[in-house]
Amino acid sequence: MLNIFNLICICFNSALFSSTFLVAKLPEAYAFLNPIVDVMPVIPLFFLLLAFVWQAAVSFR
């Protein structure tokens, strides 16, 4: 049980400190990709929503 708690704490701390990457800038050559990079963290949520839509389409069998 303690190991699971430690793992959760490590993940939570890394998520907090990884927010510093949000202020990082892309190199000038890739500046045109900024809008795509801003949306990329949300993409996994689209797959989660797709799963619910798919299950609704098949009547939650």
Curated annotation (Swiss-Prot):
Query: Alphabetically, which GO biological process terms does the record hold?
Result: photosynthesis
Stated family? Belongs to the PsbK family.
Does the keyword Transmembrane belong to this entry? yes
One short Pfam name that applies is PsbK
InterPro entries, per this entry? PSII_PsbK (IPR003687), PSII_PsbK_sf (IPR037270)
Q: What is this protein called?
A: Photosystem II reaction center protein K
User: Quaternary arrangement and interactors, per the entry?
Assistant: PSII is composed of 1 copy each of membrane proteins PsbA, PsbB, PsbC, PsbD, PsbE, PsbF, PsbH, PsbI, PsbJ, PsbK, PsbL, PsbM, PsbT, PsbX, PsbY, PsbZ, Psb30/Ycf12, at least 3 peripheral proteins of the oxygen-evolving complex and a large number of cofactors. It forms dimeric complexes.
Membrane-traversing stretches? 40-60
The propeptide sits at 1-24
Keywords associated with the record: Chloroplast, Membrane, Photosynthesis, Photosystem II, Plastid, Reaction center, Thylakoid, Transmembrane, Transmembrane helix
Any one cellular component term from GO for this entry? chloroplast thylakoid membrane
Bilayer topology reads: Single-pass membrane protein
Where, per UniProt, does this protein localize?
A: Plastid, Chloroplast thylakoid membrane
Give a short account of what the protein does. Answer: One of the components of the core complex of photosystem II (PSII). PSII is a light-driven water:plastoquinone oxidoreductase that uses light energy to abstract electrons from H(2)O, generating O(2) and a proton gradient subsequently used for ATP formation. It consists of a core antenna complex that captures photons, and an electron transfer chain that converts photonic excitation into a charge separation.
Q: Which SUPFAM superfamilies match?
A: Photosystem II reaction center protein K, PsbK
